[in-house]
Amino acid sequence: MRESEIEQYLVAKVKEKGGEVRKVKWIGRNGAPDRLVMLKGIHNHAVWVELKAEGLAALFPHTPHERQQHREHERMRAVGQRVVVLDSYAGIDALLP
């Protein structure tokens, strides 16, 4: 499954839960997650999401660009941000119970 299909599923599920998804363009930062998911109610939180094509999250990070992404994700986690890497509908369903 392509990353774009997983992205469409993420957006649909978040909207179904009453939340919002934003595609984020980072200026001067390489490797940052490309989606911000905001949920309300019992899920009242925000989570940064990096999407991958199906099967690639288990290999993350395996390219120089992904190693840079991994370092940036770790920097964000160090200051209390929740960052996840998802590559399947099941991963999205687990994130959005």
Residue ranges and their predicted role:
Residues M1-P97:
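Catalytic phosphate/metal-binding cores of nucleic-acid and nucleotide-processing enzymes, i.e., regions
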